[in-house]
């Protein structure tokens, strides 16, 4: 079962997925790393300091990796995961906290602004609704990696047992920061 762990850069995807990998021994595919390492991109955007993924090549490579493992929990970690996985968990964070996290990473002011706007406008959530069958949201604001991991585990365990309707606290659209948009 492929489960996407997605969200705006800086919401905690990589940190929490590495924790899940160690704790639950679930296979985690760090998609952004794979795209760069295996040259699964069409071009490099120097201005935005990013690569433009070739999604067809990415899908082909994932089929090679995942083929025959449909009964295993496989987590696809990336801000692009919602374009591939049918089930996604979106990590969200309060935009002012996101700004601090991205500054600490050394992001440019332009890239920080772009990501804060994307978070406040629910860009990934809207895209996930277009692409995915099941969508869940977790507010990671002020939460430790361990706390976030517990929320993810709860969601996945409920999905595996077929009880995801018992998860109203992760209902998409319950997190709203639109008032923060200038």
Curated annotation (Swiss-Prot):
GO molecular function: adenylate kinase activity; ATP binding; ATP hydrolysis activity
Annotated segments matching region LID: 104-114
Enzymatic reactions: AMP + ATP = 2 ADP; ATP + H2O = ADP + phosphate + H(+)
4Fe-4S as UniProt keyword: no
Keyword annotations: ATP-binding, Kinase, Nucleotide-binding, Ribosome biogenesis, rRNA processing, Transferase
Domain of life: Archaea
EC code: 2.7.4.3
GO terms, biological process: ribosomal small subunit biogenesis; rRNA processing
Binding residue positions for ATP: 10, 12-15, 105, 143
Region (NMP) location: 30-53
Family membership: Belongs to the adenylate kinase family. AK6 subfamily.
Assembly information from the UniProt record: Interacts with uS11. Not a structural component of 40S pre-ribosomes, but transiently interacts with them by binding to uS11.
Protein function: Broad-specificity nucleoside monophosphate (NMP) kinase that catalyzes the reversible transfer of the terminal phosphate group between nucleoside triphosphates and monophosphates. Also has ATPase activity. Involved in the late maturation steps of the 30S ribosomal particles, specifically 16S rRNA maturation. While NMP activity is not required for ribosome maturation, ATPase activity is. Associates transiently with small ribosomal subunit protein uS11. ATP hydrolysis breaks the interaction with uS11.
Protein name: Putative adenylate kinase
Organism from which the protein derives: Methanosarcina barkeri (strain Fusaro / DSM 804)
């Amino acid at each position: 079962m492929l489960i996407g762990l997605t969200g705006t850069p800086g919401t905690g995807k990589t940190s929490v997925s590495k924790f899940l990998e160690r704790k639950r021994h679930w296979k985690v595919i760090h998609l952004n790393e794979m795209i760069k390492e295996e040259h699964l991109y069409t071009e490099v955007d120097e201005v935005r300091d990013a690569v433009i993924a070739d999604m067809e090549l990415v899908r082909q490579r994932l089929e090679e990796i995942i083929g025959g493992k449909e009964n295993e929990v496989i987590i696809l970690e990336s801000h692009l995961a919602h374009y591939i996985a049918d089930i996604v968990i979106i990590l969200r964070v309060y935009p002012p906290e996101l700004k601090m996290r991205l500054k600490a990473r050394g992001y440019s002011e332009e890239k920080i602004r772009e990501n804060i706007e994307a978070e406040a406008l629910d860009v990934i959530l809207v895209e996930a609704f277009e692409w995915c069958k099941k969508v869940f949201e977790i507010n990671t604001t002020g939460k430790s990696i361990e706390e976030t991991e517990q929320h993810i585990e709860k969601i996945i365990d409920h999905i595996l047992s077929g009880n995801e309707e018992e998860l109203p606290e992760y209902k998409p659209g319950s997190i709203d920061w639109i008032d923060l948009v200038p």
